[in-house]
Amino acid sequence: GITKFSQLSIFSELNNIKNVSMDEPYAAICGITEDEILTQMSDDLNLLAARMKLPRVEVLEKLKDNYDGYHFTWPSPDIFNPFSLLNAFADGKMDSYWFGSGTPTYLLEMLNKFGVLPSKIGGTEAVAADFDAPTEHMTGITPLLYQSGYITIKDCDTQFGIYTLDIPNQEVRIGLMRSLIPSYITRDTLTTNTTVVNLARALNRDDMDGALRLLQEFLSTVPYCDNVRSEGHFQQVFYIIFSLLGM
C-alpha cells in the first residue's frame, strides 16, 4: 500500500503535488479491470482455464472472488490486485500471493494497540477524512487498514459523503484471519489450518455431526481465558474459523 503523509508546512514543496487518490478519472490507474482481462489479457485467461481444467467463465468468477473488489473512489470499476492476478496467470493456479509477500507484523501490533477485534475489521462507515488521511498521527486504525489494502471502498452515500468500507476479497480476508491465529487461537497454526480443511470437507459432504465433533475437539485445545472477556474471545475464535471457511 501507499501511506499518506501530512504536508510538513505551508511552504512545503509537497503542497505542489496534486493528490489524485480519490479522483474518479484515475480510479483504475493502480490495478487491472475485468474489461482489461477480457480484452488485453484474454489469452492469459484462456491458458489459466485450460491449466485449471475449468470453463473460462468459472475461472473469471474465481479470480473475482479472490483478487477483485478494490475501489479507490466512488463510483469506480472493480479493481483486481495486479500482483496476485499476474502471479495466478504465471503459475496457472490461484494462491494466496499477497500475504506470501510479507508478514503484516506492524498491522497486528496496531490492531492490538487500538483494540480492534477481528470481527470489527471492515463492515464500517466513515467519511473520507477518516481513512484517506495521514497515518503518522492516526487515532484509529482505519487509515492504515485502508491505505495498506486490507479494507476498501464498497459503497458511498453521496448525499452525505459517507463511505462503506470492507475487506475487498477472499484472498485478503483469509490471509488476514490466518495471521490472527497465533494471537486468538493457538501458535500451532498447522493444527488450526488442518482443522479448517477437515471442517470444510465435512461440510461439503453434509456431515454436520462430523463437523460439530471436529469443532468441539478443536475448541477443547484452545486455552481458556479466565476473565470477563472469555466469551468474547471465543466469539472471535468462531469468527476467524468461519472466515477461513469462506463464510
Q: What do these predicted regions represent?
A:
Residues 78-247:
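Extended alpha-helical interface modules used as scaffolds for assembling large macromolecular complexes
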